[in-house]
């Protein structure tokens, strides 16, 4: 999770020179400008390529795996055009962990992980439509990208998070949910959605994978708790799916894992806003646990 202190923008510094040089090696025509984003994991530099606005994303050495997944995703997009608008790729290099792409005109839907400003119905509807289109996309090459849910749940269980009853319920719910089979963005915060030319465009594909159905919906549900009507609208999307194997069961597995990660991250923060948010996350955790039991009871 990023905080404001993690991200710095402005003119490139001397420390950025080596990473910018990698971008220019990969895309010699790229003319770098100001730093758009800087953190311990990556550097994103705005600039131009042949008169077109562009972005160069360069991962720091310890975080190159994330860049590889995003490059692999663009390879999928080239092989099988995605059902949602995405920025064009101009150049990339796996060894250098560099990706140069189109810089979109427009603005992100919300800069904060947990939006505190209203999200319009049109924007939320556009994001949900993109999620729906994406889940029906079936690029064959993504078959090896299935997430190991059993392994993740066992890792959480090893931390002493689940009591015996909760653990048994989750294993049963996972069994009933079937195998991961839905291509998902994987990090669908509203800062990763740009409103550009009347469309909602998804950016930053470093966490894309084959998930259980409803991963992106579960993340939106968790993050948009303060946006009036958002959770109810998302739950309509879940309920409209064909059956429990595509609907509520996998949604709750995804939500449990996301809430665990988010609650753990919030333990590091001591500001009043984060403490208040942690209370809300704890309430969402208990609600989700109750709904897991409820879902299994109705499943028979």
Swiss-Prot record:
Spell out the SUPFAM superfamilies in the cross-references.
Protein kinase-like (PK-like)
Give the observed phenotype of the deletion mutant: Cells produce only the non-phosphorylated variants CDA3b and CDA4b, while S.coelicolor strain A3(2) / 2377 produces D-3-phosphohydroxyasparagine-containing peptide CDA2b as the major product, along with a minor amount of D-3-hydroxyasparagine variants CDA4b and CDA3b.
State which Enzyme Commission number(s) the record gives. Answer: 2.7.1.-
Signal peptide (from-to): none
**GO molecular function annotations of the record:** kinase activity
| Pathway noted in the entry | Antibiotic biosynthesis; calcium-dependent antibiotic biosynthesis
* Superkingdom, natural source: Bacteria
A biological process term (GO) from this entry? antibiotic biosynthetic process
Keywords assigned by UniProt, alphabetized = Antibiotic biosynthesis, Kinase, Transferase
A single Pfam family it belongs to is APH
Q: Does the keyword Transferase apply?
A: yes
Q: What class of enzyme is it?
A: transferase
Give a short account of what the protein does. Answer: Phosphotransferase that is responsible for the production of the 3-phosphohydroxyasparaginyl residues found at position 9 in the non-ribosomally synthesized calcium-dependent antibiotic (CDA) derivatives CDA1b and CDA2a/b. It is not known whether the phosphorylation reaction takes place before, during or after peptide assembly.
PANTHER family membership: AMINOGLYCOSIDE PHOSPHOTRANSFERASE DOMAIN-CONTAINING PROTEIN-RELATED, AMINOGLYCOSIDE PHOSPHOTRANSFERASE-RELATED-RELATED
What name does the UniProt record give this protein?
Answer: 3-hydroxyasparagine phosphotransferase
């Amino acid at each position: 999770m990023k905080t404001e202190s993690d991200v710095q923008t402005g003119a490139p510094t001397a420390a950025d020179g080596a990473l910018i040089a990698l971008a220019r090696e990969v895309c010699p025509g790229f003319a770098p400008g100001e730093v758009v984003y800087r953190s311990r994991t990556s550097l994103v530099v705005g600039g131009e390529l042949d008169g077109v606005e562009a972005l160069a994303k360069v991962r720091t050495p310890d975080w190159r795996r994330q860049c590889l997944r995003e490059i692999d995703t663009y390879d999928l997009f080239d092989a099988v055009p995605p059902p949602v608008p995405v920025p064009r790729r101009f150049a990339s290099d796996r060894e250098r962990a560099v990706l140069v792409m189109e810089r979109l005109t427009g603005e992100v839907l919300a800069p904060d992980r947990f939006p505190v400003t209203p999200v319009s119905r049109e924007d939320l509807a556009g994001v949900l439509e993109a999620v729906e289109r994406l889940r029906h996309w079936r690029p064959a090459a993504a078959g090896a990208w299935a997430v190991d849910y059993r392994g993740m749940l066992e890792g959480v269980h090893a931390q002493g998070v689940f009591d015996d009853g909760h653990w048994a319920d989750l294993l049963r719910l996972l069994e009933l949910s079937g195998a991961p089979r839905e291509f998902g963005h994987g990090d669908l915060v509203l800062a990763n959605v740009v409103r550009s030319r009347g469309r909602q465009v998804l950016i930053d594909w470093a966490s894309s994978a084959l998930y259980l159905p409803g991963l992106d919906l579960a993340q939106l549900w968790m993050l948009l708790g303060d946006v009036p009507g958002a959770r109810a609208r998302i739950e309509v999307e879940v309920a409209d799916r064909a059956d429990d194997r595509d609907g509520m069961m996998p949604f709750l597995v995804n939500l449990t894992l996301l809430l665990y990660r988010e609650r753990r991250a919030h333990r590091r923060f001591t500001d009043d806003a984060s403490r208040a948010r942690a209370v809300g996350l704890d309430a969402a955790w208990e609600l989700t646990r109750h709904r897991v039991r409820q879902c299994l009871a109705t499943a028979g």
